[in-house]
Amino acid sequence: MLRQSYLPIFDLINLNLYLTLKQNKMKKIMKHKFQYMLLLLLAIPCHSFAGEKSHVADSENLLLNKSLQQSVTIKGNVTDAAGEPLIGVSVLVKGTTNGTITDFDGNFSLSAQKGDILEISYIGYATQSVTITNNQPLKIVLKEDTKVLDEVVVTALGIKREQKALSYNVQQVKNDAFNTVKEANFMSALVGKVAGVTINSSSTGAGGAARVIMRGSKSITKDNNALYVIDGIPMFNANAGGASDSRYSTQAGSDGVADLNPDDIESINMLTGPSAAALYGNAAANGVVLINTKKGNVERTSLTVTNNTTFSDVYMMPEMQNRYGNMEGAFESWGGTTTKRYDPKKFFNTGSNVINTISFSTGTKKNQTYASASTTHSTGIIPNNSYSRYNFSIRNTANFLNDKLTLDLSANYIIQNDKNMTSQGEYFNPIPALYLFPRNDNFDEIQLYERYSVGRDLMVQYWPYDAQGMSLQNPYWIANRMNRTTKKNRYMISGGLTYKIADWVNVVGRVKVDNSDYRMQQKRYASTLGTFAGANGFYSDMTRTDRNIYADVMVNIDKRIKDFSINANIGASIKDLVYEQMGGEGDLAGIPNFFTVRNLNYSSNFKPKQFGYHDQSQSIFANLEVGWKSQVYLTLTGRNDWESMLAYTDTPSFFYPSVGLSVVLSEMFKLPEFMSYAVSYTHLRAHET
């Protein structure tokens, strides 16, 4: 039986072989390695910390009186049915983040209160719940879970499949993986938690975009980001900011997936292989992130209030040379030994991220409702960088006609504001001037970044150096007087209807409207370097609308005939995307620092802007999986897309086929005796896309 998670042995082109090692045979070897690794982990300094408080009111068991009870230390031991201790078993107080894991001898210890319920879970074993009645040691025996190998996972287009039937890799991430320590963009909390997936958080500051790359970059010049799919429907993941990898970059931004409230997410599935994404066409060439949101409870009502507060600091600074200083009035450090040194770390702040959420869940067997409201407020480590978001969501699922008809409706509304997300460019980024500041000069002096000018009768930038051929300015001026803001209002409305024709066939129809309205402004104050603003300043005011409409219909078949199983899906979809941007920018005219469109200098350096596009794609797709004795599975998929941008070309459409094979070798053949001591499960996968 399955004792641990699958261990990848090799992955050559499109061939995967998975072996599961028996724990007890490896225990002595791993014990010493684990102790050494633990010692190393304890030596690593921590540069951030977080705290979370969660209060849950349940209609069946109100826990309000728990704070009045005295905590006790609960000790116990966890073994399997043969009496062998289990290592790394999760022991968690239900409804809280208070938990621990068992040691090498299966022992655990944690503080809890009488009446608390302990949930004991381990991969390959059935989860067990124990109610604490006293502080006597617990003896817990976990039973092997034979259902693990037959676990059902959500795949492309929301299709549910047995995990062992898949010819590609699917990794599931539960809610607690990104909700224990929350980020303004929840994808950033998944860094290092999914094998084969690289997640890079941008350096734009609080609320910045996250880049998800599965199994390496596929292109040097094109987008390598994965496709995001919410409850089976693709999401438009636009970035409101300009390019962030150019020296001329001005306004970075967040991405569409960052708008989601992590507390509304039940789980995330990562489809890392191209075959896994074949049903989505070229949009999923880089992999798919399937996001499954929460539904209402059945026969249970709960109210949950959570707070998560995180602080962040600069992790690392570049090493500065202190052997050479600068001469009086010079910028370059080619002089004598420095007599005083500045620390650029003084420029940075301590960042913070505060997320508050209240959610309500209730329902019956016929109707379930989930609703939530959330606020996110973040400040970055760079001065004057902030991000705020307000999320409101509701989802209702109802069954009709003796459960043959299911209606699933959801709505989300997001208000987002960000300020001074820092681009990676050279000109609108305070970091170059900060790091190049002369080592021998007084850095504290430039903290007063503006001083009163009698001649101009206004505050002007203080920077006792010229631009040095690199358009350098006072870093504090860039952070406080070259402001960039984005205001965003977004709504997502979706509906799904499923009709069960028979036990083995159903029809599904879904539609989603995703609309985002932006207002993006830039304000550069008078005395900003002339390359970037006129004598009286610079102003840019742009509005933008993204509207994405998606709809599909699909027939699903799940039939078993003697030793054979047949799963088939056939359907069609349409996606309609409209993008519009309009506004203007230019130097200010008569009144310095008066940022209105009427004060723009229309006779010099004024640039009206208006652009956009309308794109539509229509698709048909099909999937066929044939299984034999739950041991061998053959999967065929195909999708054809008709793109509006290719309507009058020689190739108006594209076809995406794939074939996959999955063989559970350990169920087909009895393993040799010499292998059975260490291997309990073998699985062969192959696919071609």
Briefly describe each language-model feature range.
Residues 265, 367-372, 466-472, 594-600, ...:
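Active-site-adjacent bridging/hinge elements
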Residues 293, 358-362, 394-398, 493-499, ...:
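Residues on the lipid-exposed face of transmembrane beta-strands in outer-membrane beta-barrel proteins
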Residues 2-414, 492-493, 614:
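Short, small/polar-rich motifs associated with maturation and membrane association
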Residues 185, 209, 286, 353-357, ...:
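Transmembrane beta-barrel architecture of outer-membrane proteins
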Residues 648-653:
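Short glycine/threonine-rich loop-to-helix capping motif typified by GTGT followed
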Residues 148, 224-225, 230, 236, ...:
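Surface-exposed loop/interface segments of Gram-negative outer-membrane beta-barrel transport/assembly proteins
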